[in-house]
C-alpha cells in the first residue's frame, strides 16, 4: 500500500479490506464461502504506521467454510497468501477451536480486534457469540497463554540477527540486527507484564489493555521499530532482558516440573490443574452449529 497524505488509519484498512476480498475472489472464494475476516498484527496493537518513510502492512486471518470435498475427505484448508497490502492466512473455520485452545496470541487477539469483516448478519452474530467467551477462555487457559508468549519471545531472539529472505539490506543498515524483532519482543514483555499484574492484583487477566499500546510505551516501540537502538550490542542486551522478563512472568504460572499453576486454584495444598475446556467446548459447539447449518 502506498502512502497518501490525509488518509486516516480506518481508510487504509478499508482499502486493504477491499484488496484482500478481491484476492479471495481471485482464488475462487465467494462472499458466501467466508465466515469472517479479521485484521491481525500491528494494526490491532496500535503500532501501525502510515507515513512517507514507513507504511505498515495490513495482515488478516480469514476463516472460510469447508466445501463438500473438504468434509468428505476430512481436509481443512490452511494456507498463507500475499496480497497487495500484506498477507492473509486462510483457515477452515473448523480449525478455530483448536487454534484458540493453544492460546496463541495471534489468534486470541482476533477475539478483541475492532477490525472485522463478516459477509452477513448471521456471521456477525456468530463472531459476537465466540467473542462472548473470551474472558472465560483467558481464565481457563491463562498458563498456556503465558507459555505461548514466552515461546514467541524466544522466536524473536532467534530471529534478531538472522538474514531472512529480503532482510539482508535491512540488517546491514542497522549493523547486524532487525529492530522489528526487538520491537516485537518488547511488546510481548509488556503484554505478559500486564496479564500477570492484572491477574495477581484483581483475579482477572487484562489482555485487552496489554494488547493495545498507548502513550510513551507506544512511542518508544514505534521508535525502535523504525530507528532501532544505538548498536548491535545494545539490541542484544535489550533482547536478553526481554527473554529473561518473559521467562520470569511465565514461571508464575508453571512449576519447575512443568505443571500449570494459578494462585486461585490451590486447594488444601493439593495440586489442581487450572486448565479447563469449558469455553473451548462452547466455541466448538458454535462452530459445529454454523457449519451444520451451511449444509442443512
What feature does the model see in each segment?
Residues 19-75:
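Active-site nucleotide-donor binding segment shared across nucleotidyl transfer reactions
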Residues 16-28, 100, 246-249, 253:
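Hydrophobic, Leu/Ile/Phe/Ala-enriched alpha-helical segments that form helix-helix packing faces
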Residues 122-293:
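Conserved nucleotidyltransferase catalytic core and NTase-mimicking acidic/glycine-rich helix/loop elements
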Residues 36-39, 109-110, 194-197:
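A structural signal for short, well-ordered beta-strand segments and their strand-loop junctions
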Residues 55, 59, 97, 132, ...:
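Extracellular structured ligand-interaction cores
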Residues 71-162:
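A basic- and aromatic-enriched beta-loop-alpha substructure that forms the phosphate/nucleotide-
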Residues 9-13, 89, 174-181:
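Aromatic-acidic/polar surface patches that form glycan- and anion
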Residues 1-21, 29, 262, 296:
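N-terminal regions immediately upstream of nucleotidyltransferase
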